[in-house]
């Protein structure tokens, strides 16, 4: 991972907004820049990290020991189901604040692809995590591979991304520039 010398323009902007009880959505174009950004976020945090990895890229880096992160609890759907992961995450944040990284909304849709109401379930899960992280003074960061269509952020499967007044949206360009979305 050290061979990727990605530096992020405006990283301080992101760091200023990752505060207790915050809910941030990171929209990205490049999965490897996303992993490097996660590494930057995590190394500056003092909170224990709960990482829900639904696209398995981060898990691969951790399992191969290319990334070593202290205080990391890693969850993925290879080892459990989303319905098994959520109670564990909620229990952990009920006892102490954590940095919760939920990667990614795309992976959650894929996990729930057989559910006719997957859109509602995805939104409900995100709202549940958002509210519980707020009550526990945790920091919730979710990721989504997305692009703009008609001034709205949409996932590659065409679904529009949840809008929430409590959520801060950031865009990580392919050139690793971080901008805040209004």
Model region roles, listed by residue range:
Residues 56-58, 79-80, 106-108, 146-149:
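Conserved nucleotide-binding/hydrolysis micro-motifs of P-loop NTPases
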Residues 20-23, 45-46, 69-72, 96-97, ...:
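Short, well-ordered alpha-helix to beta-strand connector turns
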